[in-house]
Amino acid sequence: MKKVFLCAILASLSYPAIASSLQDQLSAVAEAEQQGKNEEQRQHDEWVAERNREIQQEKQRRANAQAAANKRAATAAANKKARQDKLDAEASADKKRDQSYEDELRSLEIQKQKLALAKEEARVKRENEFIDQELKHKAAQTDVVQSEADANRNMTEGGRDLMKSVGKAEENKSDSWFN
């Protein structure tokens, strides 16, 4: 019993110490619980902050990716436009060259036609000259023939007149007294 009594005395003496200790323990538990909650809140806040950073980084990455995609698209569009402009310029140059070539061909064709017309005019003029020469030649031949005919006629008439004169002279001679 001594032991029980001793325990009871010790317990009664230790009750305020235990009570105080229990209060301290409860406070310590509450404080530990509060620290746990604070730590949990801090961890949660850190997690939220980390998550927000990750979300912000993801947004930034997407924005950068979109900007890069937009830049690539703009570059591709600019390159496509440049290629199209180059093709249009080449097509325009080809068209201009073709038109210039066709204009040159038309000009050459017109020159050929003018030369052919001038040649034809010259040939016609020359033919007219040849015709005029031929007419003059024929006129000259006609004049020669006419002259020969006139000369022959004159000779014939002269011969006839001579014969008449000779005949008359013979007649007169025969009619004369002194024959």
From Swiss-Prot:
Residue ranges annotated as compositionally biased, kind Low complexity, are 63-79
Composition bias, kind Basic and acidic residues: at what positions? 34-61, 82-103, 158-179
Residue ranges of the region described as Disordered? 26-103, 136-179
**Superkingdom of source:** Bacteria
Q: Name one GO biological process term.
A: DNA damage response
Signal peptide start and end residues? none
Q: What is this protein called?
A: Uncharacterized protein YfgI
